[in-house]
Amino acid sequence: MTRNSASRETIDVLIDNAKSTMSYSEQLLQNAELIKSKFSEHHITHYLQLLFELLSGSLSAIYEVCSDIKNMLSTENVYTKRFHMQMINLSQYELSVYLVGRDQGGVISELITYLNKSHQDSKELEDILQQVKLLGEQCDIRLRNVTAHYDNPNTMYTMLTTLNDEDVYVKRFGNQLLIHDKILKYISSVLQIITEKLSPDKKNCTYKKSVEE
């Protein structure tokens, strides 16, 4: 198992940050799902529906991968590490498919289409889309397929023995965090604009979020 030399202190910080991010993501995800559950009760634009699908999808993936990163770094058992690498690969690939879509039908792709039809700026989302595509391209699709379908365990176990560099998955998680941060900033700015339009007297209020890096 390959790992660049990192102090125990550095590893512990990564584990603690993963725990904090999981806690934060879980709380925000609950709020997002609650809002989505109200969509059927009120008239709401397709754009806002997609916006909250983007939020909940990214939060779910962050929670899943944080859990696997934490568990991967917390153990010295090589087989346990490989299992969590396998699950990180699966989660990140599924995130890419959900946001991009196999035929450009993912959540971000739909948001961009909506904005373009409305003659509104989609540059920020297009930048996020490209980064999500790169993340998906870094995933092992064959490993994802045998993991998701589990119809050929011998092939899966053989592939797992080739997973030896946990640094690859830590770095890829770093890329995912950057994408997630951009998604949060985009959604936050949109919601702030909506709030200001609904409550003109509150234009000067500021919104702060605390995310464990």
Language-model features, listed with the residues they occupy:
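Histidine-centered, metal-coordinating catalytic motifs and their short helical/loop contexts
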Residues: 129-160
